[in-house]
Design a protein with these regions (language model features):
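Glycine-rich phosphate-binding "P-loop"
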Residues: 138, 160-161, 271-272
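Active-site beta->alpha loop and helix N-cap motifs at the rims of alpha/beta catalytic domains
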Residues: 2-11, 15-144
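Alpha-helical structural signal in soluble globular domains
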Residues: 62, 66-71, 95, 99, ...
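Catalytic alpha/beta core domains of metabolic enzymes, predominantly
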Residues: 128, 142-248
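Short, amphipathic alpha-helical "lid/cap" segments that border enzyme active or binding sites
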Residues: 25, 29-32, 149, 282-289
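Short Asp/Glu-rich motifs
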Residues: 54-55, 89, 115-116, 146, ...
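C-terminal alpha-helical cap/extension of soluble enzyme domains
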Residues: 5-16, 38-40, 200-203, 207-297
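A general structural signal for well-ordered alpha-helical segments in protein cores
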Residues: 28, 60, 64, 89, ...
């Protein structure tokens, strides 16, 4: 049995930026502190939502180190360190671990992709380079590559491969992973609209985009489930759905970064090629925030 890196709601946190595109560390610090005050169970820095794909390694490592130092062991800090180049990924994993991250979030190789055997070799090499627990990240809609349940089982045999963020949207696949891996691979939902379904299959929590705007909602949903109040967990899951729709009306993190600006945070804009949401989607986002009761009067 492997103890989970965290249990509950981990926020896939945005990276606030100044007008010139540089990282606004002061605002990142304020957002992190607000997350901790409102119940977030883990901070996931430099993931998809944090715009790691348009950061240099130096920027990514600086954001990881800043967050690790600020959080100071209050909750786990999980560092995005994925790459489609195994050698580069191993170097980034080692440097992220040296920054003090508690675990690594490693996405599947994208664009060049690989075979299932290649996934085993890639993730094994990166896990050993980092030397800290690894959460695999399966998001085939972005990468064009799916981690098959049988591959997840093979990877779960490695002592450092601790969990999987499952964002395939395929509940049947998640059930098969749970059946094959048991307690050797901790499952986290990668989709905010599937938190309770994955918890019902033995999942340990969620890596959440919605938590950026309403962390207590996602935390309380997970807590209710683990406390045995499944009716409350279900109700809170359903309460999330309008926010889920709004925050994924365009490719993540375009909507959530706009939402954070609406809420008064100095989130800034996304780096190109991501641009502002359309006017219609801005209205949808604002209406969802209003309905969720998070817009300050």
């Amino acid at each position: 049995m492997k103890n989970p890196v965290f249990t509950g709601a981990g926020v896939a946190i945005i990276t606030p930026m100044y007008e010139d595109g540089s990282i606004n560390f002061d605002e990142l610090g304020r957002i992190v502190e607000d997350q901790l005050a409102r119940g977030t169970d883990a901070i996931v820095i430099c993931g998809t939502t944090g715009e790691c794909s348009t950061m240099t390694d130096e920027e990514q490592l600086a954001a990881i180190k800043y967050t690790v130092d600020l959080v100071n062991h209050r909750v786990p800090v999980i560092a995005g360190a994925g790459s489609n180049d195994t050698d580069h990924g191993c170097a980034l994993a080692a440097k992220s671990a040296a920054c003090g991250a508690d675990a690594l979030l490693l996405v599947t190789p994208y664009y060049n992709k690989t075979s299932q055997a290649g996934l085993v070799a890639h993730f094994t090499a990166m896990a050993e380079a980092g030397g800290i627990p690894v959460i695999l990240y399966n998001v085939p809609s972005r990468t064009g590559l799916n981690i098959a349940p049988e591959t997840a089982k093979e990877l779960s045999k490695h002592p450092l491969i601790n969990g999987i963020k499952e964002a395939s949207g395929n509940i049947g696949q998640v059930a098969k992973i749970a059946a094959l891996c048991g307690d050797e691979l901790n499952i986290y939902s990668g989709n905010d609209d599937q938190v309770v379904p994955l918890l019902s299959l033995g999942g340990k929590g969620v890596i959440s985009v919605v938590s950026n705007v309403k962390p207590e909602l996602v935390h309380n949903c997970c807590k209710a489930w683990f406390d045995g109040d499944t009716a409350k967990a279900r109700a809170l899951q359903l309460e999330m759905l309008p926010l889920c729709d709004a925050l994924f009306c365009e490719v993540n993190p375009i909507p959530v970064k706009y939402a954070m600006n609406v809420l008064g945070w100095e989130a800034g804009e996304c780096r190109l090629p991501l641009v502002e949401p359309s006017d219609a989607h801005k209205e949808q986002i604002e209406q969802a925030l209003q309905a969720a009761g998070v817009i300050k009067e």
